[in-house]
């Protein structure tokens, strides 16, 4: 089934790659020879989290990798010790006035750190979820484009598309005189437009010039008044220059007034037509055919975050949230009486005696349909009436507690009624529930382009600014390189274009050439967001800084890893110290220095197992990392690949960059979907496959991406997506509550003789409800103290001393431990503690099996990484009884995992398959890819160059497809493993 394509011309040969690597090694050796060997960061007595009085030296101005098992203490050393101390020292050098705006970091638990530079952290947790944030805005490239379009853009008429030029005073007067005779008008000079401040000088200037009236924010003021404006609010101020009635003979006076207004407002003029629309004129631009004037072009005219540039309907978002008929009635095979209507407020319509049922009964009599008819069989006009209402009044017979009667009702429709309920509710929970019945649709006015039509009518090189931001970064670079400008435009835009090209180049260098500037940052993966910030830092050109990165290779295909490594080395070559928390083998081999933290996780970690170059790490037998790097340990390739038990077929997939493709996915085995970043993996698996299956099998309220359908679902009964989203949003959520084992533990405590004697139920042992919890802190265990210009301080509750429960509850013990002691246990400790309680031990054992032995049962969800959250979800699924017809979907589950952890994860994934289930994984990790039963490789490139299936088959089959980047690296991996004798 492998699909062969032409091999790309630019694909480097193995010999060429070795030659380039040799050149780089020579450069690195030369650079290291001039570095002062004594120049290092000296850390003494680090005890943050699980670090055990750790002492080590890290060379400065080098690329240093911190590695080790998950939970071994890498992040505690890198972020909670080195970064925290570097940031704290820098902030302490500032004044107390400045610190009140910046906050102050707590001193880490470390005895001493020497040789530390100001530190910059580039992690994955600070992705901006604001819908107004895009790749263009966070990289500031869009700001430069706004400036470019404002300075050299060519305006066109938004109505007819004709290129427009500046207006003269005579043209403005002629246009005003075309108004009907006797029309009353005001000549206004817009001196302030949407700017904050008190604007006292502007008001005084108008007063001194002899003008009598001002219009401020739509209200009229006499200049003799004492006008005070709020300085933190944006204001609009217009000077009323003249009031006129259109008639013959006013041309001279009108001309004088227009000239005065233009002089006051720097070439701008507004004519307020009484009982008509406001007319705007500019000495800058106007269409000679349509008579339409375009406001002065400024950088803010192209900002969708500014009212002067944003579409007035969607306020610059580019979309609207609206209730979707297909979510309000998710299953059209049901009748109304069978619960077809799922939206809140109408779920009771099947219950006789409810007012909703009475309304629908009246509608059935009026429009002649039955509530027992499947919704799909209702007439189109009936469906339309149910959704959007009717102007015809219906008589509703209703018998309630206060009596019975007939009430005339005009039915607004399910959608309008639900919209009203959504607007009126003050509950965030209810709003979130209503929003689950909504879908995102492009704004009907701007078509999703976010800007005013006047702004979209300005072009550079024949392209408007929105279409420019929709180009992939690679296409954008080609456009800029071939952009033809006039001599004047070139002179004006030269410096701006230089800055844009540099930033675009940095994005390409970190492997993000498939992204567009219009891409919302909320849709980026953690790795993509981190690499964007990395590109921004390179552009800053800082020297002598300590950069700390958290797995920048996440989500990056092996093909693009070399680009990332070159970027990290460029950052280092600027004489910066680059510390990377990483598990990627290529990054470790390319590093100047490696620190292996371990030997285990949690309480078994926190020590330096080995440090030095990659070769020196490999020589340390105690280093698990070294054993994997040297090949002494490896994840074995299966002897045999499983055969599919069936197939499902996705037809006509065309969401995002997918090219209307058909894709067959095998059942009963483990399938890995691969491809370079942006090739269409997530579009296929998350947007189409998961959402379609969730709606069809799980009856979820989801709308799948564009496709024709999916065949073969009769072999499945449910779909489960195991992603890296948090298991909870508050500290009250923890692994014990998420897996459900805490209910069992509370029941166990309630069954102890002491609890029975006191009449305690299992609710007594919950920290979420009154009774057993400490009421002084509400069961939180901590209290927040506001410190004004210092950051808020969290201190243990003085009553319960951080134990969350009251004294009486803590007196109840099981095997000598109270409920707090159990929550404070690590998973590893709890497995032994509950060994004689099979139901509890089984659930905790699955947490241990997925490599979470170091995590505490009561560890707040807010302290868990995305990878840890995903493994907790995996463990929860493993602890449930399998139906054998489940399809599990995972998106890069190896994020944050060491070689040893990946080996454990592989065992878990194959256990799910052994239970008769199907596992579909989006993954770049070659150790997972090589052990899969089947590979679907997307590509060949990212963005517009992707969206097709390049290869499909077993790893051995895909390895033979020369056009597959994944196949190239899988082949190298299989050949290497074969040479090492792993098979």
Which residues does each predicted region cover?
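Conserved phosphate-binding elements of NTP-dependent enzyme cores
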Residues: 1-983
